[in-house]
Each structure stands twice: as structure tokens, then as C-alpha cells.
Amino acid sequence: MSYARRSCICGLFLLFLALVCEANSGFIGVKDSHFELNGSPFLFNGFNSYWLMHVAADPTERYKVTEVLKDASVAGLSVCRTWAFSDGGDRALQISPGIYDERVFQGLDFVIAEAKKYGIRLILSFVNQWNDFGGKAQYVWWARNAGAQISNDDEFYTHPMLKKYLKNHIEKVVTRLNSITKVAYKDDPTIMAWELMNEPRDQADYSGKTVNGWVQEMASFVKSLDNKHLLEVGMEGFYGDSIPERKSVNPGYQVGTDFISNHLINEIDFATIHAYTDQWVSGQSDDAQLVWMEKWITSHWEDARNILKKPLVLAEFGKSSRGQGSRDIFMSSVYRNVYNLAKEGGTMAGSLVWQLMAHGMENYDDGYCIVLGQTPSTTQIISDQAHVMTALARSLN
């Protein structure tokens, strides 16, 4: 390829990025149960890449972050969900309560700066239900070491010391001044939303009332620090006691949350659901799993539209990468369902597939890895959904 042609292609790509960034300026808001950007409906297709900050903490590995965000932008993806936590352990952001590794924080700074460059919005989560990257178990361990009497990890939602630890972390993240962009996180529209917790569960109170109290307290605290950004809980979508008949939609069990009551809290701006048929309804055939999946999505869309009156995001879904053909069929079906519901006014706002990675990241692969370009059929399905959702948003304007 000639130098002139390479220069032309590079120039066109930079122009494309400039136009994308200009179109994406401003904060995402909510109006009449749908997302809005600069006065127009906002629909999207997006992805999860939980590892971005963890990898970017090492400057020699930041090219992996750039690769994923660049490839996602080229494919038309516009929202990414990732972690703003790493509590204890390897490359910890929060080494101990209130003590942070600036090197890791600068990794998150880089993630936000790169996302802005490629026109991708971020949903940033504050803490994990699970032990990966610390989670609530790490908070409990810290509190016990400080002398607190805690009987189980689910006291995370009620114990004053644990709630104080989390509030300190939330404030540290929300008020952070980005070392690269020189913009405080709370003032940066690159961030679409904050997430209170990845997949909160409470085995000590299946009614969802304990988690509800915690969500109310934490949501009010976040909004006291930042009323510009949207806020969501991080829910998987399990129904609880508020509408008993809806519990039949659950995959056979409850987890101590209540999709309805937890999302009716005023400070929560939109609802989320997750879905993993390989795990939740593993004994069923692929066809039966697709039927269950459609019912799961549609039931929550009905409730988001009619009861919550808030947008709904399928914030995690995935299919094992062991069978590419079955995964492509599954993803096409899910995307078709999301699109068809989005046509009904935009309450169903988009979906975030789990998960995108860069080349050479096998050690991070949890069985759901997608490398854009490495599996052309899957990449095409993802990109097609991004473009039809963008076109649909324009038609709803």
C-alpha cells in the first residue's frame, strides 16, 4: 500500500472518530422511560470488558485496551461496562480501606481517556458481589481485621463499617480528577452511568428488603456527589416478593433481590437484567433455553415499561464460546428480541454482550471470550445489531 493511500485511510479514520466524538458529546439522560442524548433517543449495542483498568495499570499492556475500544468503535458499539474496583490482591486499586494505588487509578484514567477518543460510553461498577477482584468478601475481611464482629458476608448490606468503607470508595472514584484528561470523573460525559454493585445477592434475606434499604442509602449518597450521571444498581433481574406471581419467571430460585422494588427507588435511573442460560437453565435444550431467554427479556421489558417507567438494559448476556455456531444462533435470537422490543418506544434500550477481549488474553478468558475479527460471523452479528439500533434511534426521533 502506498504512503499516500495509507495517509488517506488514516485521515479518514481520524475524521470518523472526530465526528463520532462530536455526535456523542453531552450526558446521557432519561426521558419518558427511554435514554436521550442531546434531545434525541439513544439506543445502543455494547459490550462488557471487566478487565480494562486491571490491564491498563501496566503501561506496557495498554495497547490491549486500545485494541478492544478501537475495534468496538469500528464495529459500531457505543457502550462498554467495566470495573472501577479491584479490592486487595494483584494490581489492587484499593489496597486497604481508603488506601489506593495511584498506578492502578491512572490505568482507569487511561481507560476513560481512550473510551472518549473512540466515542464509547462507560458504565463503571463500584464493587463486586463475587470474590473476583476482592468483592464484598474483601470488605468483610478488612472490617474483621479492624475488630468488627461480622457473622457472614451478607452483613455487607447492613454493617455500618462496611457501608462506610464502600461510601469512601464511591467518593474516591466519583470525585477523581483524571490525570490524562484533567476532567473530574463526575464531570465527564464519557461515563454514561455508575453501577452500585455487580450482581448484588443476599442469601440472608430472600425478600429483597435488605438489599432495597442498601440500594436506597447508597443511591442517595451517589446522587449527593454527582447528579449529572445516571445510576443503576447492577441487578441480574431476579423477581422477589413485591409481585409474587412474577417469581415463576425466575430460573427456579431467588437471590435476595427484587427487580421491581429495587428499581422503583427514585435515585435509580434505569433497570438492568443479566442472563446466562448455560448456567441458569443448563438442563434444557438450546431451543428451550432460547424460549426461556425470550420470556426473561420480555417480562422485564413489560415491567420496566408499565411499572417502573424506566429504560431497561440487558447488561450482561453470553453463550459459551465452545460452540461458535450455537453461540451465533443464540446471539442473533437475543439481538432480534432486543431490537423488536426497542421498536416499541425505546424502553428496551440496548444490550451488553459478555465479553470482548484483545488478542493474546487467554489467561482472562472465562469461557465467553469474543475477539472481534477473530470470529468473523460473530463479529458481523454484533456489528449488524449496533447499526440497526443506531438507525432505530434515529427513526424514533
From Swiss-Prot:
Ranges annotated as spanning the membrane: none
Keywords attached to this entry: Glycosidase, Hydrolase, Secreted, Signal
Residues where substrate binds: 83, 198, 276, 354
Biological process annotations from GO: polysaccharide catabolic process
GO terms, molecular function: mannan endo-1,4-beta-mannosidase activity
Record-linked Pfam families: Cellulase
Major localization listed first in the record, in broad terms: secreted
Signal sequence annotation: 1-23
Catalytic activity: Random hydrolysis of (1->4)-beta-D-mannosidic linkages in mannans, galactomannans and glucomannans
GO CC term, one of those recorded: extracellular region
Family: Belongs to the glycosyl hydrolase 5 (cellulase A) family.
Designated name of the protein: Mannan endo-1,4-beta-mannosidase 1
